[in-house]
Regions:
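Alpha-helical transmembrane segments and their short interhelical loops
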Residues: 47-48, 55-105, 166
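Short amphipathic alpha-helical coupling elements at transmembrane boundaries
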Residues: 38-42, 106, 148-152
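Transmembrane helix boundary and interhelical loop/hinge segments in multi-pass membrane proteins
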Residues: 21-43
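Long, hydrophobic alpha-helical segments
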Residues: 7-27
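Junction motif at the cytosolic side of a transmembrane helix
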Residues: 100, 104, 168-189
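Short hydrophobic, aromatic-rich alpha-helical segments embedded in or entering the lipid bilayer
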Residues: 130-166
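Hydrophobic/aromatic residues in alpha-helical transmembrane segments
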Residues: 20-24, 68, 96-101, 176-180
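Transmembrane helix segments
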Residues: 105-144
Length: 189
């Protein structure tokens, strides 16, 4: 019988986490298209609160979807902390990337065009699951930490320590959000 864990990692990564990316990019494009950025620019709260609140909602929803998927596919035999934190932080990371790409894009088609290389590069850290390289080869990619936590949660071997995976994911969250803040702030000026 084949182990469903590798397929579950792919499903958990692609469905909830990538949904966070697409929704964040589309939310920003919608705000831009509906001319609500002017209203956002005069809010009494900083822009990052607005973005963090949207990303937090997307991340919570993504984590709940991942939990339902994991329970439906495999029951309760998981490393729950790694599964939930890996999904939440990965979605938060990709929401930041989504806001950045959405702010660079003039329309939905341009957003899709910018998304293709980003999504291809983000999927490359899945290659070690097919026996092509190790996670160490893919450290420069933002999705490596989150994928590693999902693999660890499902009992699959990983090349980095648990805390190394968390550190990787937090570092790339900081980088993605710094990029998102810089680009979205330009839209408000």
């Amino acid at each position: 019988e084949q182990n469903p864990a590798p397929f579950l990692v792919i499903l958990l990564f692609n469905d909830p986490v990538m949904t966070g990316y697409v929704f964040a990019a589309v939310l920003w494009l919608f705000d831009k298209d509906q001319h609500t950025l002017q209203a956002i620019s005069v809010l009494p709260i900083p822009l990052h609160y607005y973005l963090f609140s949207k990303a937090t909602i997307l991340s919570v929803l993504s984590t709940l979807v991942a939990l339902v998927i994991a329970l439906a596919v495999r029951g309760t035999g998981y490393g729950w902390m790694d599964l939930l934190a890996g999904t939440f932080l990965s979605t938060f990371l990709f929401a930041g990337l989504g806001f950045a790409v959405g702010s660079k894009s003039r329309n939905f088609n341009e957003m899709l065009l910018y998304s293709i290389p980003l999504l291809i590069l983000s999927g490359l850290p899945l290659l070690p699951m097919a026996g092509l390289g190790t996670a160490l080869h893919f450290l420069p990619f933002p999705s490596t930490g989150g994928l590693g936590l999902l693999q660890q949660a499902l009992g699959l071997p990983v090349a980095l320590s648990r805390w190394g995976l968390y550190a990787h994911l937090l570092l790339f969250n900081a980088l993605a959000w710094a990029w998102a803040f810089r680009l979205t702030q330009k839209q408000l000026l």
